[in-house]
Amino acid sequence: MCTGKCARFVGLSLIPLSLVCIVANALLLVPNGQTTWTKDHLSLQVWLMAGFVGGGLMVLCPGISAVRAGGKGCCGAGCCGNRCRMLRSVFCSAIGLLGAIYCLSVSGTGLRIGPQCLMNGSWDYHFQDTAGSYLLNRTQWNLCVEPPDVVLWNVTLFSLLVAASCLEILLCGVQLVNASIGVLCGDCRKKQGSSQ
């Protein structure tokens, strides 16, 4: 597969993954679909907006850049061919890689610590000292009185963010290597309308 086609494939994969991260982070802001607890009782990991900023916007830009690097257009002609777009894609992929790593680390921490919830009359991170063992003991999930089903909500959405950011790390890494090869060697696709 040539560098242009690979870039296009990676970009078309990164764009929906970044949108999934943005939506998952938006849903984390409204536990159980309600805004009642949004002001004072969301965990720090939700407020860090790792899905929106890291896995979302910081990966959306390299996704779009990779699609453009894999396309044919006015920048693909001339003395440098498609190398200018590939160079831009190298830098964007590095930024996307950092964003996906940020999303993975914050989401993983959110899974390990658990949500802030009302249990035994106090709002706290009641699962913080379990080192993530609460994830396997679903009977503990019902101990959180408010917000209702917050543990299931957080586990589902943070797990989705972890999975999406792992894929984003892989794809941004592939595009980083692919675009570097594209800068050094050029695109292997034959030019349309050449006289050879």
Swiss-Prot record:
Residue ranges crossing the lipid bilayer per the database entry: 10-30, 46-66, 90-110, 157-177
Topology, Extracellular side: 31-45, 111-156
A single Gene Ontology CC term: lysosomal membrane
Molecular function GO labels: arginine binding
Pfam family, one: L6_membrane
Keywords for the protein's UniProt record, in alphabetical order: Cell membrane, Glycoprotein, Lysosome, Membrane, Transmembrane, Transmembrane helix
Ranges where the record places region Interaction with MTOR and CASTOR1: 90-196
Membrane topology (Cytoplasmic): 1-9, 67-89, 178-196
Source organism superkingdom: Eukaryota
InterPro entries assigned: L6_membrane
Positions that bind L-arginine: 123-128
UniProt key word Transcription regulation: no
Topological relation to the membrane, as annotated: Multi-pass membrane protein
Biological processes, Gene Ontology terms: regulation of G1/S transition of mitotic cell cycle
Glycan attachment positions: 120, 137, 154
Subcellular location: Lysosome membrane; Cell membrane
Record PANTHER family: TRANSMEMBRANE 4 L6 FAMILY MEMBER 1-RELATED, TRANSMEMBRANE 4 L6 FAMILY MEMBER 5
Function (record text): Acts as a lysosomal membrane arginine sensor. Forms a complex with MTOR and SLC38A9 on lysosomal membranes in an arginine-regulated manner, leading to arginine efflux which enables the activation of mTORC1 which subsequently leads to RPS6KB1 and EIF4EBP1 phosphorylations. Facilitates cell cycle G1/S phase progression and the translocation of the CDK4-CCND1 complex into the nucleus. CDKN1B and RHOA/ROCK signaling activity are involved in TM4SF5-mediated acceleration of G1/S phase progression.
Family: Belongs to the L6 tetraspanin family.
Known partners and oligomeric status: Interacts with MTOR; the interaction is positively regulated by arginine and is negatively regulated by leucine. Interacts with SLC38A9. Interacts with SLC7A1; the interaction is negatively regulated by arginine. Interacts with CASTOR1; the interaction is positively regulated by leucine and is negatively regulated by arginine.
Name the UniProt record assigns to this protein: Transmembrane 4 L6 family member 5
Organism: Bos taurus
Gene (name only): TM4SF5
